[in-house]
Amino acid sequence: MSTKQTEKMEVGIVIPENVKVRLAGHMLHVEGPLGKTHKNFKKIPVDIQINDDKIMLKALGERKKYYAILNTSRSLIQTLCDGVVNGYTIKMKIVYSHFPITVKVEGKKVLIENFQGERAYRVSNIWNDTKVTPKGDDVIITGHVLTDVTQTAAEIELNSRVKNLSLIHISEPTRPRLI
């Protein structure tokens, strides 16, 4: 590899003002105004160092594979920092043809009632610190960890999927929620 390509093997991420980042072994802890989260980098071949206001990532090899892993790691850390500052929101729409679907939240479960006229309700899990609020024909999912918010939305969508019939689907995709 030429020297120009090896210069790309180190990337810096600027830490936002009100975010605290610390590294304990291979575990990166990120804390902000909306909450705290962590990511384990044990099996990811990237060297992480935290300076005053920057996180420095360095690839452990010079091949294209390591460059791809470096950029993926940068994206993961940027997502963690954005989440604890702005949060993430997904808006889902309840669509039905005859039987009105009702959505209720009980603890860490989302109950989908009267789906296709079924007497039993369908149950979806709420992941970690994600909040689900049903409002009329909309279900709004918010949280500070992107994977938890999207996984909660995916479970609700999969539990209400029947071919060519009623469903609950994502009407507005994930984007950072601005405070």
Predicted regions and their residues:
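Short, surface-exposed charged micro-motifs
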Residues: N18-K20, P45-D47, P100-T102, K131
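Acidic (E/D-rich), amphipathic helical modules within compact regulatory domains
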Residues: H29-Q78, D82
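Extended, positively charged loop/linker patches that create polyanion-binding surfaces
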Residues: A59-T142
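N-terminal, positively charged regions that mediate nucleic acid binding
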Residues: M1-K42
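Single conserved hydrophobic/aromatic residue that forms the stacking wall/gate
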Residues: I168-I179
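Mixed-charge, glycine-accented linear interaction segment located at domain edges/termini
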Residues: K135-L167
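Extended intrinsically disordered, low-complexity coil regions enriched in Ser, Thr, Gly, Ala
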Residues: T37-K42, Y121-W127, L146-T147, Q151-A153, ...
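Signal for well-folded cores of large energy- and translation-related assemblies
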Residues: A24, G35, Q78-V85, T89, ...
